[in-house]
Amino acid sequence: MITVVGGTFSKLHKGHKALLEKAIETGNEIVIGLTSDEYVKRNKVYPAIPYKERYRNLYNYMVKKTNKFRIRPIDDRNGNAPYERDYEIIVVSPETYQRSLKINEIRIQNGLPPLKIIRVPYVLAEDLFPISSTRIINGEIDGNGRRLKPVKVAIATNNSAKLKATNDFFHKLMKNFDVIQNTDYKLETQQPFGEVTMNMATKRAMQSLGDNDYAIGIESGIVYERFSRKYFDFHYCVVIDRFGNVTRGSSSGFEVPDRIIDLIKRDMSFSQAYGKVIDTNGIDDSTGIVGKISNGRVRRYDLIMECIRNAFIPRFDPDFYDTTYTPP
């Protein structure tokens, strides 16, 4: 039986190799459908790399792995997969998974058994976006996913702790990045409650995206918890990327006394309300009120860092969250 995999393979990268390795693991003979030059000219945004060159690079890689393979030209997205009786398995990326479902529909209409579909997860570059030939050709990343151009991260804030936490978080993830501070944003209220907190964080991010890779909005707000009938202070983070994907995360919450809530409801900010109860002199952005009342055991910086980290969790495994990366 035969395992089929298809693609353009303009720049043979880690994502392509993951597909090919998975095909080899099936133990079947492998048929690789390699798109023709005509197909590339019709469907790709980058300059066409000649079929012969793509064939040679693909052949040289595969021949080191197995001798049970053939490379054949295809001139459309489906290739021969809807019609070949000997095809048993198709190996696809997340981008081509829906196409494989369509291929199986056509096979069934043609009286052929559906192919077993093996979906290979995204292979992410250093910047947590999928490796692709387009990005390599554009000089954005190399074939291993190392970022060549700085990752541009925008954050809407005047708060030094939010700015520092964003820098520190990205420093743990990657080497090549720039954090751009956006101070030109509008707030609806000094102290948001409930869903208004999430809405304001989202607007902060949206007002900062522009042509950046990521935009981050962080907002602290008061959330009412019905079981205990208490109010809690949370930090909420929204991350929007250049593909339009939105992820969210929150920090741990700590209880806010009722007398503080009463003051906040009189249109005071969180800091102003606490200033009526405790001495807030000398409290900086990183320490925050939580640092004062916890005697330094927990700082506002820690809560900000936590909400950023949690907002990025879905980005570490986009397949688990069914994330797609459609170019803007």
From Swiss-Prot:
Pfam families: CTP_transf_like, NTPase_I-T. It catalyses: (R)-4'-phosphopantetheine + ATP + H(+) = 3'-dephospho-CoA + diphosphate; XTP + H2O = XDP + phosphate + H(+); ITP + H2O = IDP + phosphate + H(+). Its EC number is 2.7.7.3, 3.6.1.73. Its cofactor is Mg(2+); Mn(2+). It is found in: Cytoplasm. Residues 153-328 are annotated as: Inosine/xanthosine triphosphatase. InterPro entries: Cyt_trans-like, ITPase-like_fam, Non_canon_purine_NTPase, NTPase/PRRC1, PPAT_arch, Rossmann-like_a/b/a_fold, YjjX_NTPase. The keyword Iron does not apply. GO terms for molecular function: ATP binding; ITPase activity; metal ion binding; pantetheine-phosphate adenylyltransferase activity; ribonucleoside triphosphate phosphatase activity. Its main location: cytoplasm. It comes from the Archaea. HAMAP family: Non_canon_purine_NTPase_YjjX, PPAT_arch. Reversibly transfers an adenylyl group from ATP to 4'-phosphopantetheine, yielding dephospho-CoA (dPCoA) and pyrophosphate. In the N-terminal section; belongs to the eukaryotic CoaD family. This is Bifunctional phosphopantetheine adenylyltransferase/NTP phosphatase. It comes from Thermoplasma volcanium (strain ATCC 51530 / DSM 4299 / JCM 9571 / NBRC 15438 / GSS1). The lineage of its organism: Archaea, Methanobacteriati, Thermoplasmatota, Thermoplasmata, Thermoplasmatales.
